[in-house]
């Protein structure tokens, strides 16, 4: 099932105090194969130039996610978020980034996918299909939304799965997400936490610790 050559990358989302060029050069010297970033439009050209200069793979762009819940509602707010994510897809294509990591939902109170949401995500899927960008839908809270997207768009070439080990432990309560979506695996996030620490799941459980610590 999982055949091929795999490359190991690391988050380049900031915090080092280094320039993009110096940061990527350091990762290359240490032995990383690639890196992923957030969607910082002011630095996209720098990321691409550094990846090419040091023969590194720019593996993915993590799309904005704080407003994704509005995509499941009718109306302008959801359409605006959808438009933003479509632009992120276009930037992935323009800067030769093969995967856009995307959250299907954010929040812990709602659990009902809607037709409006599926239409909005359908616009993103169609754009990614046309541009050859793989969408790595991440296992986060709200598994119902991930399931609905996979059911609706199963036959689309852009539909992919980004497996987050830490999210599986806390947000998914240890459920085997690879058993559900491993056939579409296109990206991974390896990190750790201590599981659900209270009666209810909350984002503070998602500690993003180094694995094994």
Each predicted region: which residue ranges?
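N-terminal pre-domain/capping segments
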Residues: 1-87, 93
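Hydrophobic faces of well-ordered beta-strands that scaffold small-molecule active sites
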Residues: 6-12, 35-37, 58-63, 100-102, ...
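Active-site-proximal loop/turn and secondary-structure-junction residues that shape catalytic pockets
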Residues: 14-16, 41-43, 62-67, 104-108, ...
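Active-site-adjacent beta->alpha loops and helix N-cap segments on the catalytic face
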Residues: 41-50, 109-118, 144
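Surface-exposed, active-site-proximal loop segments in enzymatic domains
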Residues: 64-83, 106-116, 200-210
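An active-site-proximal structural segment forming one wall of the substrate-binding cleft
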Residues: 75-99, 117-131
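Active-site groove signature of glycoside hydrolases
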Residues: 88, 92-112, 131, 136-140
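Acidic/histidine-rich catalytic cores of soluble enzymes
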Residues: 122-212
